[in-house]
Amino acid sequence: SIFKLMVAIAGLESGALTPDTKYHSPGYFYLGNVRFDDWKKGGHGTLDLRGAIVNSCNVYFYQAGLKVGIEEMVRVSRAFGLGETPGLGLGDEARGNLPNPQPRRRGQPGWSAGNTVITSIGQGLVVTSPMQLLVMVSAIANGGTIYRPWVVKKIAALSGETLDEYEPEAIRQVPIKPETFAFIRQAML
């Protein structure tokens, strides 16, 4: 469900969503004749974007994801470091996966709206590591700076002498408007 934040940010930044965008959740969403359920049976009623984040409403994000589009969701997710190794330097780090909506190999079905629906709640082809999600959420909290994660701050001798110390290392800035970060942070509280 934390991936829903990427959909919200992508929607706000692209103009596909506003804080006042409302969708109704009766507990399910139909795309054609395929039913996608919410986690809450009976639904959440009508919610704006903040309410959808607070309640983690699947039905809201199914519809928001279709409006935002898969390309924008993936673009914003990559900007936050999803789909790449976090850079811990501990060997075999998980890269994770983000969907590639480009046409698939011959004989395989192409990308569908149903794929976009399930991606919008972080399922389907979305694979992330806990460290990637920590990097993403810390960037939201600090206004968009992606820092290289560390698991060790300082190495000290038994005597207490500092042998090595690691300072925060900014990797890049996520190009998101301050008001978008402020809105998302407030909704997360």
List PLM regions with ranges.
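Beta-lactam-recognizing serine transpeptidase/beta-lactamase-like catalytic domain environment
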Residues: 1, 6-189
